[in-house]
């Protein structure tokens, strides 16, 4: 492994970072770029050089995001938002707890993160329905698996909807009026990518009561500036992209795993399928 500075002028380069330096894009010496992030949509904007391996860091992100989702689901079931509101205002009637067991959670995205979310929610007794690509194998922690085209009957039955989607052309504004207006009082959590949700549509669904409340860890514009429309959304909590923070140990462990796979002549599990977008 050599860096961009020093070494033989034509030595192959293996780079680790958030974005390759502009002057290295298109450099024929670059053979492999390992992203320190799980999301790679920004890297793929404008195309990716042919013949350059792109891998990503997942680490323990699924575990952390799964715990985050479970925390907010349980908080909702126990009426924590209402308790907090009553603490800051004159006392009112408390709502009874809404137990998680047997309630339905639609988890969009059945990769590392969605699988970890389903595992935690299932352990708490929720009925988890994974919404993913048709070629994904059945099984895992999901009670049921469907494709995006089959979610219609489930939208009105879901108590929780968790967005763990990557950002691709197919998932941009995936949650727009059609899906959000079909909900019947579900709580919506976004732990995937901000641009998979239309904020105007979410605002309309909140105002109409289709969405009971929203927890948004990711946004298209981060951090949102004062006056950004997201601050006006009712019954919405923002958590500043903190659900699945990547640690340095995650980066080194995943890079090492990719390196060992390549040494063994195998494709790394964390290799990005550029044509698919993740």
Swiss-Prot record:
The keyword Cell division does not apply. It comes from the Bacteria. NAD(+) binds at residues 112-113, 191-193, 217, 241-244. Keywords: NAD, Oxidoreductase. It comes from Streptomyces coelicolor. InterPro entries: D-isomer_DH_NAD-bd (IPR006140), NAD(P)-bd_dom_sf (IPR036291). SUPFAM superfamilies: NAD(P)-binding Rossmann-fold domains. This is Uncharacterized protein in mprR 3'region. Belongs to the D-isomer specific 2-hydroxyacid dehydrogenase family. Its EC number is 1.-.-.-.
């Amino acid at each position: 492994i050599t860096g961009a500075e020093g070494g033989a002028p034509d030595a192959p380069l293996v780079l680790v970072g958030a974005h390759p330096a502009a002057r290295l894009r298109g450099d024929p010496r670059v053979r492999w770029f390992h992203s320190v992030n799980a999301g790679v949509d920004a890297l793929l904007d404008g195309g990716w050089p042919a013949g350059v391996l792109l891998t990503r860091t997942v680490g323990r992100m699924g575990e952390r995001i799964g715990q985050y989702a479970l925390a907010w689901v349980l908080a909702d079931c126990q009426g924590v938002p209402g308790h907090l509101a009553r603490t800051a205002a004159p006392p009112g009637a408390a709502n009874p707890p809404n137990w998680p067991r047997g309630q339905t959670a639609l988890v969009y995205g059945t990769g590392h993160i969605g699988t970890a979310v389903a595992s935690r929610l299932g352990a708490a007794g929720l009925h988890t329905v994974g919404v993913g690509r048709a070629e994904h194998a059945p099984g895992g922690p999901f009670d049921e698996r469907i494709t995006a085209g089959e979610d219609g009957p489930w939208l009105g039955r879901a108590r929780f909807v968790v967005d763990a989607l990557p950002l691709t052309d197919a998932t941009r504004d995936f949650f727009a009026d059609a899906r959000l207006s079909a909900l019947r009082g579900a709580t919506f959590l976004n732990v995937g990518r901000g641009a998979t949700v239309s904020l105007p549509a979410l605002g309309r669904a909140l105002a109409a009561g289709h969405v009971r409340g929203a927890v948004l860890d990711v946004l298209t514009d981060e951090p949102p500036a004062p006056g950004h429309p997201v601050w006006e959304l009712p019954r919405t909590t923002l958590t500043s992209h903190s659900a699945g923070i990547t640690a340095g140990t995650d980066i080194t462990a995943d890079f090492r795993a990719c390196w060992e796979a390549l040494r063994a002549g195998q494709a790394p599990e964390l290799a990005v399928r550029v044509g698919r977008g993740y």
